């Protein structure tokens, strides 16, 4: 088994090249299972310490991550490829009516382009320029392949401990590894999930995940964490029905980033103001989300999404006051709120009708069983 896995990781296996070619279409959405570790790993506020096993222990959002080989954290690249695999896994196993298929494949070029990597050679005006452009594209492909292999290797050497309520029961997970094997070629990315990860994921609810998240620069980790948090909040049905899917308090968003908290601002010896250390980087991250096409708009607002006036915005002169503001935002490419509400209501009615049908069928079977018993 170990030998087979080794060959698979090194790209020597003869597995199929078939993949999910339409998974990363621009301006589209993907469906993905969503659970505690999958969302927590997008949070960049991690604390690195050493334990007795010489592994790196990272604590974030009540989960503990153990990374071998001295890795101090999991970056944006690791979370992107993991969630790409989860989306492909959801597409393949989302019906939950059969034993999950652990192996998923998707198109390398489509994924690279979704991540903003220019892997296709442009048409140039001269043979010399074309040769240089072809070489540039080939180099970009090789570098991205190398990066993906490093991302997948980090995930393979990462185990996670956490507790989570699944199907109304509290469950404890220890030492779970999500990715057990991988293969990267110039055509296909193939990931193999561990059996324990697959069994866990098929119990989870599904969410809508914008493809635009992959276009965020890997180095802009605050923007990525914020983007994941805003899009997850925007996709929740209960938020849509309450009319709050596009509103979040700045203070809560900051908790998902490495930007300084109020306590860190007080303790710091930096001479930079709260505006330069927190507000400006926060707004730069939001602008990055507009640049990559995730957000169509954002602004500070009052409780019902009413924008702050210029006078109100300029009057804010402290970190405390700024962090209590609401951020109003719109995630691009989602259906309008009214349409989303109608779909949610229709799904509720369908679920209700199915439950009533099941209940009636159960009663009917009991009556027939009772009748047969009486005749006997």
Predicted regions and their residues:
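Charged, alpha-helix-forming regions
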Residues: 1-376
């Amino acid at each position: 088994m170990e030998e087979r896995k080794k060959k698979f990781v090194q790209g020597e296996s003869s597995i199929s090249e078939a993949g999910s070619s339409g998974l990363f279409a621009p301006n589209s959405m993907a469906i993905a299972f969503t659970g505690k570790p999958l969302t927590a790993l997008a949070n960049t506020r991690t604390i690195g310490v050493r334990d007795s096993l010489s592994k790196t222990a990272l604590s974030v959002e009540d989960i503990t991550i153990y990374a071998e080989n001295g890795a101090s954290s999991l970056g944006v690249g690791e979370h992107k490829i993991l969630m790409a695999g989860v989306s492909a896994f959801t597409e393949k196993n989302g019906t939950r009516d059969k034993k999950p298929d652990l192996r998923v494949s998707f198109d390398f070029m489509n994924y690279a382009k979704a991540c903003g990597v220019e892997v296709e050679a442009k048409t140039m005006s001269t043979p010399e320029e074309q040769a240089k452009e072809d070489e540039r594209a080939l180099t970009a492909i090789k570098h991205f392949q190398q990066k993906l292999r490093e991302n997948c290797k980090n995930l393979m050497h990462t185990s996670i401990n956490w507790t989570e309520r699944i199907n109304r029961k509290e469950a404890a997970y220890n030492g779970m590894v999500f990715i057990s094997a991988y293969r990267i070629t110039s055509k296909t990315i193939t990931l193999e999930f561990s059996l324990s990860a697959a069994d866990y994921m098929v119990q989870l609810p599904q969410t809508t995940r914008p493809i635009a998240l992959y276009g965020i620069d890997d180095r802009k980790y605050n923007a990525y964490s914020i983007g994941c948090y805003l899009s997850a909040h925007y996709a929740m049905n209960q938020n849509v029905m309450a009319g709050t899917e596009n509103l979040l308090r700045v203070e809560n968003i900051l908790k998902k980033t490495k930007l300084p908290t109020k306590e860190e601002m007080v303790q710091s010896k930096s001479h930079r103001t709260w505006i330069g250390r927190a507000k400006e980087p926060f707004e730069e991250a939001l602008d990055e989300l507009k640049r990559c096409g995730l957000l169509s708009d954002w602004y500070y607002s009052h409780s019902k999404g009413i924008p702050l006036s210029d006078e109100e915005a300029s009057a804010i002169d402290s970190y405390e006051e700024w962090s209590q503001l609401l951020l109003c935002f719109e995630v691009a490419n989602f259906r309008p709120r009214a349409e989303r509400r109608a779909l949610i209501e229709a799904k509720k009615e369908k679920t209700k009708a199915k439950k009533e049908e099941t209940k009636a069928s159960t009663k009917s079977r009991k009556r027939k069983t009772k009748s047969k018993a009486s005749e006997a």
